[in-house]
């Protein structure tokens, strides 16, 4: 017999109250990049340069979190100069690139920001993300994440990575903390 969970209606549809309870405690959102903030595709130019696309809605959600006093960090296994520029544009102060073991960066963030694991949300899309996701208070997988990651996450976004999944999570965090209405009218 399956368990019946209490749900709350949100602009993204019904969400388990347990997820919103966890989101209420979030003081730091950690994002992966490839497959989360981007669609996971890497475009190669004729000169060998790499290009990625980022969703403006995700950027707006991040700015709303930062304006609401919630920290945002990026931990990624790859390294890309364009990511430094994106973080500067959005006001993200915590960028960890080239991290094959994301737990090290995660622990550094906990120490640096004096946070507990229960105050952290992490959004990822692949197995490299699981070690951190298993530690945080709110673990989130994007809709098109690796199939082994989906059942392990506290919440699976309805929107795919690079298409607004981070915005969905930002909105849910703000909604759970009664701050979503304050996000209106901000600009990035």
Regions found by a protein language model. Name each.
Residues 1-31, 179-188:
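Non-catalytic pre-domain segments flanking phosphatase-related domains
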Residues 23-42, 133, 166:
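Asp-based phosphoryl-transfer active-site loop
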Residues 62-86, 96-97, 133:
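Substrate-recognition element of Asp-dependent hydrolases with the DxDx(T/V) motif
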């Amino acid at each position: 017999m399956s368990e019946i969970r209490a749900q709350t209606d949100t602009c993204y549809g019904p969400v388990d109250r347990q997820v919103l309870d966890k989101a209420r405690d979030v003081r730091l959102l950690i994002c992966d990049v490839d497959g989360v903030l981007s669609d996971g595709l890497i475009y190669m130019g004729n000169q060998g340069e790499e290009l990625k696309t980022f969703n403006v809605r995700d950027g707006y959600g991040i700015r709303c979190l930062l304006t609401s006093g919630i920290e945002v960090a990026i931990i990624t296994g790859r390294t890309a100069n364009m990511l430094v520029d994106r973080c500067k544009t959005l006001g993200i102060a915590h960028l960890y690139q080239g991290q094959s073991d994301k737990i090290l960066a995660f622990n550094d963030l906990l120490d640096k920001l004096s946070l507990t694991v229960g105050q952290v949300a992490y959004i990822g899309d692949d197995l490299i993300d699981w070690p951190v996701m298993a530690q945080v208070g709110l673990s989130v997988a994007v809709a098109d994440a690796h199939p082994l990651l989906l059942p392990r996450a506290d919440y699976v976004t309805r929107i795919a990575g690079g298409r607004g999944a981070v915005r969905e999570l930002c909105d849910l965090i703000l909604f759970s903390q009664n701050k979503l209405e304050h996000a209106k009218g901000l600009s990035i």
